[in-house]
From Swiss-Prot:
Cleaves internal linkages in 1,3-beta-glucan. May contribute to biomass degradation by hydrolyzing the 1,3-beta-linked plant polymer callose that is present in decomposing plant tissue. It comes from the Bacteria. The gene is Lam81A. This is Glucan endo-1,3-beta-D-glucosidase. Changing residue 439 to A: Decreases enzyme activity on laminarin but not 1,3;1,4-mixed linkage glucan. One of its GO terms (molecular function) is glucan endo-1,3-beta-D-glucosidase activity. Changing residue 460 to A: Severely decreases enzyme activity.
Length: 758
């Protein structure tokens, strides 16, 4: 059974305990399309589900609709930390799974919202997984509430408002990542807090109570003029016909008075904005909260930051902190905080060095180009995507060695396949995209890995299509024009990560969780452990492809989206998948790397019964020039490679090319030597080719490792160092000559559409 088959099987069996685009302006997407096909330039998609195909479904295969309230008006979000509230994966569970917002965790139930603080890790599965499991300290509800289901009433960038109603009583709670508060609006009865153990009350201040339960400290705040009635494990506050309350998680009882001023400053919205400044090679991200004072005049709140945020923030930190599966969270005070990251460039390809054997490169390109099936039997969005990516990487190599006929033949292959997929030709079309206006998503058929039924992995799949489109655009700008294939390409891109908040066809950043700093793969998050992300590198591949495409078509919004995603995820990936700072994994966890990040922890396993090489490699592939982030710290890259070798007791034998490419980011000479000894006998990983691996290794053997101490005033550059010698590379996506200035004073003049090296 192939690794794909194993991956598909485990995903399928693991259970849980138009707006048409481009042409300069958006058109109104009809709520009930008059025709099955919606044309965008030369391309089209269908609004009718292909015969025999399935859209979003529950675990039994029955179609499901988003679980939202009657007053919900936003695009439907999937692939987030709270998605099990909106996507009912299991027919017997209308309330959703555990929700890990950090520092708090939650689970909706008929009588209210469970609230807990998972601050103690446990090791499970023979120590392969660490997890901070949700265990409720109390249920926040209304006296007599018996809601048949939980629904989503609204959301913002990292919060969600959950609705529990039974026709007489209604509880709406707003919860969010980094929020130590729970905000509740109630009607139909008294607010009710039922603890899971008798609490210790250490503070009574009329409408506010401080308690400790299960070793965790909370402050309960009801409206002024009300009091809390206490009866063993049940506390109630009569707020009349309707009212509000908040609950705060306190680091210690001594912090009661630091949280009380914000008890009635209810968070109503959260917003992430980012600004990329090429001149300074800086990405500035600002996280804002909007609050409403239910009493008093207080504004802002207290926010707990993940390590990738507080270690890069320019905002003053307090001395308050919490535990989380990502490491210690630090607290800021106010209505916003800002992070700053250095951008280290995204290249479309590496240069080919003169020392490489160009005749061998040509022969290896021909082996791919003239294979009996260059697509290797691919038919669905994932495997077709990987084949597109493999062939796309060969185009600039062929061009760099003067093999123009090979380059053009490869481009023809890419164009024909892309045009087939980007055109919906009716019921018999075996390669097309379908827009689901109920779920606000674009699904490619044939689908795979639950990209249709579970809305999994859209950025993983579609990133390959965007790479192919960017490669074509690099050599044929007319192909990507608004009159031809550009509108359909950018529609595919925007399904996965839409930067335009006014484009109601798709949610903003479906495949990226801005507070978490990375994406979530599962559309429904229907797991007791929350959501998960396995292949961080395929998410990074999408980001790189978006940045390159945006630059090539002159769309700064898409370019900056790609830069934001790539830079932010690189910061999170090294910390949460590879524990680069040493404080993400808990004490006693014996592994150097996890194959998957879960909402509740990390797992040294993957979705199929793979080898150690695959566990490490699924977070490296596909290897492209956008993968240089894996070598931003060559010592850390070397440690990761040695970690795998130590575990194996030998050099990698599976996906050897992926691991040679990764090894080359710290020891390119050794990686090239290994390739030279085995290049005629090894089997390439399905998304890789011998030509690309050889070119990658030979270039890095000459250039050295990535040098992040030097930046440039363009999104598309890299600097390498071999001893005292630096090599500078830049790409010019425009139609005019471009002078790139590096931070050490070096300049490169780059011809239109070309790479330059100095």
């Amino acid at each position: 059974m192939s690794h794909a088959s194993r991956r598909r099987w485990r995903r399928a069996t693991t259970s849980a305990a138009t707006a048409a685009l481009l042409c300069g302006a958006l058109l109104t997407f009809p709520s009930a399309p008059a025709a099955a096909q919606v044309r965008l330039g030369s391309g089209s998609y269908t609004t009718v589900l292909p015969p025999g195909a399935s859209g979003p479904s529950d675990h039994t295969g029955a179609p499901v609709a988003p679980k939202v309230t009657a007053d919900f008006t936003q695009p439907v979000v999937t692939n987030d930390w709270w998605s099990s509230l909106i996507f009912q994966r299991y027919p017997g569970n209308p309330y959703g799974e555990n929700l890990y917002a950090h520092p708090l965790s939650f689970k909706a139930q008929a009588h209210g919202l469970e609230v807990g603080y998972p601050d103690t890790p446990e090791l499970v599965a023979d120590g392969l997984k660490y997890q901070y499991t949700h265990s409720p300290d109390f249920v926040l509800g209304i006296h007599g509430l018996n809601a048949p289901a939980a629904k989503v009433a609204g959301y913002s960038d990292w919060t969600v408002t959950a609705d529990l109603s039974d026709g007489t009583r209604q509880l709406r709670t707003t919860i969010g990542q980094g929020l130590p508060f729970v905000y509740a609006d109630v009607s139909g009865g008294p607010i009710r807090v039922e603890f899971t153990a008798p609490p210790t009350v250490w503070r009574r201040s009329g409408n506010a109570v401080g308690v400790t339960v299960n070793g965790h400290h909370y402050a309960l705040f009801a409206p002024s003029g009300t009091t809390w009635s206490e009866s063993d494990t049940v506390f109630t506050a009569d707020v009349g016909g309707s009212g509000y309350a908040s609950v705060a998680l306190l680091p210690s009882p001594d912090d009661f008075d630091r949280y009380a001023p914000y008890a009635y400053s209810f968070v109503t919205s959260t917003t992430l904005t980012y600004d990329y400044d090429p001149a300074s090679a800086t990405l500035t991200s600002t996280y804002r909260v909007t609050t409403e004072a239910r009493e008093g005049t207080a504004q802002g709140t207290l926010l707990a930051l993940y390590p990738h945020q507080w270690k890069e923030t320019t905002t003053a930190l307090t001395d308050l902190s919490y535990a989380s599966p990502r490491g210690p969270m630090r607290v800021v005070e106010g209505d916003r905080f800002t992070t700053e990251l250095t951008t280290h460039g995204i290249l479309p390809s590496l240069p080919t060095v003169d020392s490489a054997d160009h005749q061998r490169l040509r022969a290896l390109i021909d082996a791919e180009l003239h294979a009996s099936d260059p697509w290797k039997g691919a038919s669905d969005t994932y495997w077709t995507g990987k084949a597109l990516g493999r062939l796309a990487q060969l185009v600039p190599i062929a061009d760099s060695i003067g093999y123009t006929a090979g380059r053009d033949a490869l481009l023809d292959l890419l164009k024909n396949k892309m045009e087939d997929w980007l055109t919906a030709d009716g019921p018999g079309d075996n390669a097309q995209f379908y827009y689901d206006d109920q779920w606000d998503t674009l699904i490619g058929f044939p689908a795979s890995f639950g990209s249709n039924t579970e809305l999994n992995d859209h950025d993983f799949h579609y990133g390959y299509f965007i790479t192919a489109a960017a490669t074509i655009a690099r050599y044929d700008r007319s192909w990507i024009s608004e009159e031809r294939w550009g509108p359909m390409v950018t529609t595919v891109l925007r399904d996965a990560n839409n930067p335009d908040r006014d484009d109601e066809r798709f949610p903003w950043l479906r495949s990226f969780s801005p507070y978490a700093g990375h994406g979530w793969a599962s559309g429904h998050a229907g797991f007791a452990s929350g959501n998960n992300q396995e292949s961080s590198s395929e998410a990074m591949h999408f980001a790189a492809s978006a940045a390159l495409l945006g630059s090539l078509i002159g769309d700064e919004e898409l370019r900056d989206l790609g830069v934001y995603l790539h830079t932010t995820q690189a910061s999170a990936m090294r910390r949460y998948w590879q524990n680069a700072d040493g404080d993400a994994f808990p004490a006693g966890y014996s592994h150097d790397v996890v194959g998957m990040v879960w909402s509740d922890g990390g797992d040294h396993r993957i979705w199929w019964d793979g080898t150690p090489e695959e566990l490490y490699g699924i977070n490296y592939l596909p290897i492209t020039a956008g993968s240089l982030y894996l070598g931003h710290d060559p010592e850390h890259a070397a440690a990761m490679h040695q970690s795998l070798v130590t575990r194996l007791g030998r050099q990698p034998q599976v996906w050897r090319d992926i691991h040679w490419a990764h090894q080359a980011l710290s020891d390119p000479d050794a990686a090239l030597a290994a390739f030279e000894a085995q290049w005629q006998s090894y089997e390439p990983e399905s998304g890789s080719s011998k030509a690309h691996t050889y070119q990658w290794l030979s270039t890095l053997a000459e250039f050295g490792t990535v040098d992040t101490s030097v930046t440039a005033d363009t999104p598309h550059y890299a600097v390498f160092r071999d001893g005292d010698r630096r090599t500078y590379v830049a790409f010019n996506p425009t139609g005019q000559p471009l002078t790139v200035t590096f931070s050490d004073g070096t300049t490169l003049t780059v011809p239109p559409g070309q790479l330059a090296t100095g």
